[in-house]
Amino acid sequence: DVESRGLGDVYKRQGFASAIGFAYGERFQRGLLDPETPKEDSPFYHKIWAICGEGDIEEGISGEAASLAANQKLGNLTVIFDANRIQIEGDTNLVLAEDVLKRFQAYGWYTDEFSFIQPDGSYKEDIEGLADVIAKAEKAAPDQPKLIKVHSLIAWPTPGKTNDPSSHGSKLGAEAVAGLKKLLGYDPEESFHVDEEALAHARKVAERGLEAHKEWDEKFDAWRKANPDKAALYDRLKAGELPEGFDKALDDLEATFEVGKGVATRGASGSVLNAIAAVMPELWGGSADLGGSNKTDLKGAATFAPAECATKQWPNCNEFGRQLHFGVREFTMGTITNGILLGSHTRPFGGTFFMFSDYERSAVRLAALMEIPNLYIWSHDSVAVGEDGPTHQPVEHLASFRAIPQLEVIRPADAFETAEAYRYFFEKKNTLPGAMVLTRQGVPVLAETAAKAKDGVKKGAYVLVDTEGTPDVILMASGSEVQWAVAAAKTLAGEGVKARVVSVPSMEWFEEQDAEYKEAVLPAAVKARVSVEAGVAMPWYKYLGSYGKPVSIEQFGLQGDGAQNMIDLGITAEHVVEAAKASIAEVEAAK
């Protein structure tokens, strides 16, 4: 259960792949802390056990993730497939015709099966027999993930409900529960009774667990004594603290930024990742086959994969590498990195094009629901993508992801804001996921952000350019459009109009600020406002008010040069000036 807040259907479609993320996390964390010890002797080695049903097997993501698990030789993962042939709409023969075990064998999994349904048609939940099959699998396939198919009957032995589809998604009902109690020899009128034999068994299991825990503690204590440096790293990771040198790494990088130079924020992001990776050994990640485009490659890092996976492009593969490759599997990438976070003390990230974040969305939503600090890196964030056309040009995505509660959407204006966004995301000891939304095209490094980003970005929105006295209009913008707001403010100033520019890298971070700060940035008395963003304007109306004007894109993109697309769709300084004047005029007319 990787969600823990309610109905299984919420999470089961991702649980299979998340379990694979747990296995990734175990191996990488062991490589950080105890790489030389044979894995069976390491206190950081553990096995991952997952239970799934037909619904999980039917979901496409399970196949995607299973393929990766076999490629990674995740021998510490065992999945028990409860094959009761029932789902909400009835017998799975309607929809699940293939031989599942052969499919998983083709991926590279070890498979076996065991049946609680006896040859004579009787039913016996033979746990000892199942344990023997699992032990056999452990011995036969130490370097393969394992799928054990268990043939079972749903709701056995409940009278009238055994092997009935209604048992899958509905209550058994008082009559059926009473019948089950009677069948098992209990008083049908008595509730919440725990049999003494069951209680004694549970206590015996608890005692066994305590003994195993004691043995592990002894192994861990011996490791700690023998590895003081690694123990210090473990303590830091467990506490969620950043390493010494984190701030300096970012400060040194920012010192290389040249005001006025065009730098794509995806490129700045790649520089930041490499700078902080040098001092954060727990940081690892990659992309869904777009590493070179997303700038998510860690220079000089080994690839997380068995040595035999090495290629001409990626010759350095080992089981403890920190460069991840997911293939074209965005949803799987999101769920595996979720699982890594849940199962280890490491910090993963995953990148793709912003347009393809749609395929990852369900994993992102679940991370927000679980309050885990996954890091999603989404580049190529607007119609400026250009020639690939509207299929690759996100326009509604910023609005739709901002609508997810507890997801922090971050769209920096330039290299300085990008560096400061990463600084704050990690420094705030975040328990929420963050999405870095980044440009394909170069954007100028602004003198204004050089002076103000360090204090401003962490507030979510801040005054980038101001005027003396009360402004006539406030120009709000995010990402690559901040440059046009700054240019428009200069034009307006030349015409005697006082314009304030507010950079808004993260609406979520801005909403965390107190009322006094919000009022200082967006004073209620200034009703003339403009928002500038290369996407639908929906999220901006709460800041625009009654007289504000959005400069936005309310249609799908265009096939053509990216810069020309921006012009053709009205994302220009000239259009911002027009919108500012229109907003001011409406305010004046209303007086």
Predicted regions mapped to residue ranges:
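A short, small-residue-rich loop immediately preceding and capping a beta-strand
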Residues: 8, 36, 44-59, 77-78, ...
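Terminal amphipathic helices with adjacent charged low-complexity linkers/tails
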Residues: 152-158, 162-244
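Single conserved hydrophobic/aromatic residue that forms the stacking wall/gate
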Residues: 1-7, 11
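Flexible, small-/acidic-enriched active-site or ligand-binding loops
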Residues: 392-395
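Thiamine diphosphate
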Residues: 4-5, 28-30, 37-45, 58, ...
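Short glycine/serine/threonine-rich phosphate/pyrophosphate-binding segments
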Residues: 15-19, 58-64, 331-335, 358-361, ...
